[in-house]
């Protein structure tokens, strides 16, 4: 890894990286419907169980979007995939706002999840197209920072809109999607695009199947995702079981968001200089340790410490993971590599609520021991992956050096 400091690296990032991050911030800031979807369904008069079912439907759409989005990013080009995602997301949100029967709400929630998250593989692939290996951790860090900042600030405005009318949530969500889509068409480069006749059938699937290092990374990522999403499920149950209120739980999650805003970019100045694999393993291990420490004490101070530990793991792992996938992926199938990573992360997202709750019901300590074990296994899997050869890294970066239009 290079020795450039973070300020120098950030100054050296090309303009489209900043534009992509700015557009992503606007879109994530306006992701009102995702945050308030359960409350909206209950507002329509449906049960809590029905609300949860609709939220799960949205999640199903996001998982499908990971694989489909990777294919679209490689076929249409990154800019085309981004615009398609944003414009179709706006349409899906408007349609969902008019749905009233549970079946229709369920169906449009799947479509909304699919279209809204279709942009992720294209964004990750475009970042990899735009910068070489030395700048990738910083580029993915800025993009992730924009996502988290948007998610942190958006719900405040969303809550105010919901007080006036839930319809305003859908209109605001659609408007920010349209704004990002327009920005993509006007200001972002096309990125790498592969014509169908230039790629043999099943080439991407075969490439991923042969890539032992990437396969191990996908398994590790799924394990890390399962651990991470306990923060939104069993961690809430454990906090209440310790005698704390929902306000304390919300404050603990706010510590996670605040730490990311304050510390992630400074951390990148360190992680961008270190080989990828040890950094990834450290991040996954810290996530496991952070959740594994939860049963040792129910004191608020101790729970805050555990949040800080797994948050540091998250900040160490995520930007470097994006750069690592970019390093491994051939330029012409980079979108599908990014999509496969998103799919593996989605598996953990789907399993976390149900399996985590099952483990918690068996024994409150068991789920946290499993999280610790998952962190250890995930770190070991990453460390066991073969180091990418210098020739492969050069080939993966070759697509970044030609002009993008």
Predicted regions and their residues:
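Juxtamembrane intracellular "pre-TM" segments in multi-pass secondary transporters
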Residues: 1-14, 189-219, 400-405
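Helix-to-loop junctions at the C-terminal end of transmembrane segments
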Residues: 65-77, 263-276, 360
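Structural signature of the two symmetry-related core transmembrane helices
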Residues: 80-94, 278-293
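Helix-loop boundary and gating motifs at the non-cytosolic
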Residues: 10-59, 214-254
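Residue-level signature of mid-helix packing/kink "hotspots" within the transmembrane helices
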Residues: 32, 59-63, 67, 151-152, ...
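C-terminal membrane-cytosol helix-exit motif in multi-pass small-molecule transporters
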Residues: 176-194, 381-386
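Cytoplasmic helix-loop-helix junction between adjacent transmembrane helices
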Residues: 108-149
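Conserved MFS/SLC helix-loop-helix module at the cytosolic interface between two early adjacent transmembrane helices
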Residues: 64-100
């Amino acid at each position: 890894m290079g020795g450039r400091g973070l300020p120098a690296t950030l100054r050296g990032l090309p303009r489209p990286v900043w534009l992509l991050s700015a557009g992503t911030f606007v879109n994530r800031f306006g992701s009102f419907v995702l945050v308030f979807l359960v409350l909206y369904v209950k507002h329509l008069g449906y049960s809590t169980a029905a609300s949860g079912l609709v939220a799960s439907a949205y999640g199903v759409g996001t998982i499908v979007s990971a694989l489909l989005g990777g294919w679209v990013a490689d076929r249409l080009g990154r800019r085309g995939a981004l615009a398609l995602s944003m414009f179709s997301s706006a349409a899906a949100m408007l349609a969902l706002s008019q749905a009233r029967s549970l079946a229709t709400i369920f169906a449009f929630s799947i479509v909304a999840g699919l279209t809204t998250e279709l942009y992720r593989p294209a964004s990750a692939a475009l970042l990899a197209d735009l910068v070489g290996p030395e700048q990738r951790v910083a580029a993915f860090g800025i993009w992730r920072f924009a996502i988290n900042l948007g998610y942190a600030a958006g719900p405040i405005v969303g809550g105010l809109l919901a007080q006036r009318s839930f319809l305003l949530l859908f209109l605001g969500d659609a408007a920010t999607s349209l704004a990002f889509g327009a920005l993509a068409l006007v200001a972002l480069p096309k990125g790498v695009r592969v014509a169908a006749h230039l790629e043999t059938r099943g080439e991407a699937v075969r490439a991923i199947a042969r890539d032992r290092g990437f396969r191990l990374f996908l398994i590790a990522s799924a394990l890390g995702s399962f651990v991470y999403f306990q923060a939104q499920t069993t961690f809430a149950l454990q906090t209440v079981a310790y005698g704390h209120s929902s306000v304390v739980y919300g404050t603990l999650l706010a510590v996670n968001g605040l730490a990311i805003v304050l510390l992630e970019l400074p951390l990148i100045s360190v992680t961008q200089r270190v080989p990828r694999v040890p950094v990834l393993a450290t991040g996954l291990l810290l996530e496991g340790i952070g959740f594994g420490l939860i049963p040792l004490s129910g004191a608020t101070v101790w729970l805050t410490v555990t949040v800080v530990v797994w948050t540091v793991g998250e900040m160490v792992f995520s930007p470097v993971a994006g750069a690592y996938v970019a390093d491994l992926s051939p330029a012409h199938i980079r979108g599908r590599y990014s999509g496969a990573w998103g799919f593996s992360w989605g598996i953990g997202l789907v399993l976390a609520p149900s399996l985590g709750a099952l483990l918690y019901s068996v024994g409150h300590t068991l789920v946290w021991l499993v999280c610790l074990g998952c962190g250890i296994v995930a770190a070991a899997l990453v460390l066991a992956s073969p180091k990418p050869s210098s020739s492969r890294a050069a080939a993966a970066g070759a697509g970044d050096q030609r002009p993008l239009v």
